[in-house]
Amino acid sequence: MESFGEQLRALREERKLTVNQLATYSGVSAAGISRIENGKRGVPKPATIKKLAEALKIPYEGLMYKAGYIEEVHEARAPYETKCKLLEKAEAYDLKNLALLENEKWQYLNKEDLLMLDHYFSFISDEAKKRSADD
């Protein structure tokens, strides 16, 4: 079984991030990330894992499992599945810095904003469906 550091490196590389980029996005020092990945430091504390999970745009629970803090990951919750699909789609088109994927931006939205976003998303989705039917 791969160590936590090896798994962290694989996740970072899958997202085509450098150690310095992950450090910038997470607030965890580049040296700290490097030590974790190279096995020179033990498993980080849950607070550090949370920062890394958010920067990697993966569920915190999944990274806690990889770190050995929890024994099983319960079935993925719908919001995580949706976010993962959105992330996969963005990565397929090499769109790395979409505001839509930034957790901190969501905190400012109220109910009306979310309903408007849902309406706009439905419109865009319907238009895309029409375009794909025409192809």
Swiss-Prot record:
Any Pfam family hit: HTH_31
SUPFAM superfamilies according to UniProt: lambda repressor-like DNA-binding domains
PROSITE patterns, sorted: HTH_CROC1 (PS50943)
Keywords, in A-Z order: DNA-binding, Repressor, Transcription, Transcription regulation
Highest rank taxon of the organism: Bacteria
DNA-binding region per UniProt: 19-38
Positions of the HTH cro/C1-type domain: 8-63
Deletion phenotype: Cells lacking this gene display a derepression of rapG and rapH expression, which leads to a down-regulation of sfrA that in turn leads to the expression abolition of both comK and the late com operon comG.
Annotated coiled-coil segments of the chain: none
InterPro entries: Bact_TransReg_Diox, Cro/C1-type_HTH, Lambda_DNA-bd_dom_sf, RghR
GO annotation terms (biological process): regulation of DNA-templated transcription
GO molecular function: DNA binding; DNA-binding transcription factor activity
Functional note: Represses the expression of yvaM and both rapG and rapH. Binds directly to the promoter regions of yvaM, rapG and rapH.
UniProt protein name: HTH-type transcriptional repressor RghR
Organism: Bacillus subtilis (strain 168)
Phylogenetic lineage: Bacteria, Bacillati, Bacillota, Bacilli, Bacillales
Gene this chain is encoded by: rghR
